[in-house]
């Protein structure tokens, strides 16, 4: 993978709920998850801020809260990210891509806190209700931002774009499309394992 693969940090309100959902979305997009921060992860605020600052992820995915639920913990996580002023591993002149996929009621506050400090993109909630995950919109945004922001900083990428006769897509997305095409053509149910 270019530059060692997409390295992401994810956040959630409850570690074993929205934190894990955010992690699944990132992993499903082919990312390497370097840390999962959550309101209940046992770390003090200054420890969370320092961790964000030192990890230098390529991208951050923020999740948390069900739609219509409380917003205070989601806003708190946004404030930690803002206080850390995270810088990307590559391309120090650009803003860090950040995807917000949490409680839609917190969107205005998250935009106010992080809109100027990051390349913020808002998408559908990863867990709109407790009983259901909605990972695809966040996964698709990860792919889009990876190509738009992260890969633009990779050496040789612009030349590759000039040489390619078709749009470039992240490897996990390409593999997924190949598997879907094979399954459809052969009338099979497939499962893929990326090792």
Mark where each language-model region is.
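Nucleotide/phosphate-binding catalytic cleft detector across ATP-hydrolyzing
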Residues: 1-189
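Short glycine-aspartate micro-motif
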Residues: 190-194
């Amino acid at each position: 993978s270019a530059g060692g693969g997409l390295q992401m940090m994810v956040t959630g309100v409850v570690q074993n709920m929205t934190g894990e959902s955010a992690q699944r979305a990132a992993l499903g997009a082919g990312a390497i998850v370097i840390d999962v921060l959550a309101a209940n992860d046992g770390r003090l605020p200054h420890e969370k801020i320092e961790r964000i600052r030192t990890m230098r992820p390529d991208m951050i995915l923020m999740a948390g809260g069900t739609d219509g639920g409380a917003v205070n913990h989601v806003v708190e996580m946004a404030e930690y990210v803002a206080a850390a002023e995270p810088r990307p591993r590559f391309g120090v002149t650009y803003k860090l891509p950040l995807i917000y996929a949490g409680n839609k009621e917190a969107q205005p506050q998250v935009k106010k806190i992080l809109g100027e400090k990051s390349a913020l993109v808002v998408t559908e909630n990863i867990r709109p209700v407790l009983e259901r995950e909605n990972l695809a919109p966040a996964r698709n945004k990860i792919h889009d931002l990876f190509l738009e922001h992260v890969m633009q900083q990779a050496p040789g990428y612009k030349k590759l774009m000039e040489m390619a006769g078709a749009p470039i897509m992240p490897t996990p997305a390409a593999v997924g499309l190949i598997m879907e095409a094979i399954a459809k053509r052969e009338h099979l149910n497939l499962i893929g394992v990326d090792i």
